[in-house]
Amino acid sequence: GEAPLDNAGKLVSALPETSNLIVDPLDVLESQEPPSRFRSFMNDLQNHVVNTGSLGILHCLEGRSVPPLRDTTEHFADVVFHLQTNIKGDEVENKLAIPKFRGGRAPSDIIKLDLVERVSIDTSRDIA
């Protein structure tokens, strides 16, 4: 079969104007060798998204093994969202941090989210 970066590059170049592209998860592409090929793919993706007025969402998993090129992914990203989920007994707590917001101002506070049937944001000030 084709190498994952080659296949992904063909799909990206075929995206029509004003597309929404979701890569879920990006981990397989971040793990390809050599690293220069991944950087080239990210450059092409960024250029195509900008030139077509599109949106790219790259879902990056953090777990036992984070791919070595995750820093490269975050460098290319315009906005980085970090969602942290903690489980205490039978309660689930979700917190969202936005450490990078290119061209804007990232919130300095961590945002507590209630992810049930719909998303609500806890606007009380106990969001640290």
Residue ranges of each PLM-predicted region?
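Phosphate-binding/switch region of NTP-binding enzymes
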Residues: 60-120
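Substrate-engagement module of ASCE P-loop NTPases
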Residues: 33, 37-63
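Hydrophobic, well-ordered secondary-structure segments
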Residues: 8, 23, 39-42, 74
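NTP-binding/hydrolysis catalytic cores, primarily Walker-type P-loop NTPases
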Residues: 8-16, 113-128
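Conserved beta-strand segments of the P-loop GTPase G domain that flank and frequently precede/overlap
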Residues: 24, 29-31, 57-61, 83-84
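Short, Asp-centered acidic motifs that coordinate Mg2+ and/or phosphate
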Residues: 20, 55, 79
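Conserved catalytic network of the ASCE P-loop NTPase/AAA+ motor domain
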Residues: 12-16, 47-52, 72-75
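Conserved inter-motif catalytic segment of the P-loop NTP-binding fold
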Residues: 1-35
